[in-house]
Design a protein with these regions (language model features):
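Acidic, PIN/NYN-like endoribonuclease modules and their adjacent C-terminal/linker elements
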Residues: 1-8, 12-20, 26, 35, ...
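Basic, amphipathic alpha-helical patches used to engage nucleic acids or provide basic targeting signals
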Residues: 40, 50
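Acidic, metal-binding active-site segment of PIN/NYN-like and related structure-specific nucleases
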Residues: 52-65
Length: 116
């Protein structure tokens, strides 16, 4: 399973579901970096040093960081989804589809609502 680093705004219920699925998830809060306004570039650098991929819903900024620097532990950029368990399952499936995470940008999107 994957070693992940959840940024400050990442939903804690999703973190808990990912842990149940067997992933090693460290949160910004657990790392002692909460409420410090740590720049995204430093979040990415910390994760790389810790050999972890970043979990984020801050897609725009982290996609830009990936384009500027592909040498990182991986970025999993998710759309917002209040169905925490479904989001965790999509993240898990996206991770399982990859051989490794370093240097990768993985986008996890909420499925479109069914048309009626």
């Amino acid at each position: 399973m994957a070693r992940l680093y959840a940024d400050e705004q990442y939903p804690h219920p999703v973190v808990e579901y990912l842990r149940v699925l067997g992933h090693d998830v460290l949160t910004v809060q657990e790392a002692g970096k909460a409420n410090q306004k740590v720049p995204d570039s430093e979040v990415l650098a910390f994760a790389a040093i810790a050999c972890r991929a970043v979990l984020t819903q801050n897609r725009k900024d982290f996609i830009q960081l990936h384009r500027a620097q592909t040498s990182h532990g991986g970025i999993i950029a998710c759309t917002n989804d209040r169905n925490w368990e479904a989001l965790a399952n999509r993240v898990d499936a996206a991770i399982a589809a990859e051989e490794s995470l370093p240097g990768k940008l993985i986008r996890v999107v909420r499925p479109a609502a069914p048309q009626s």
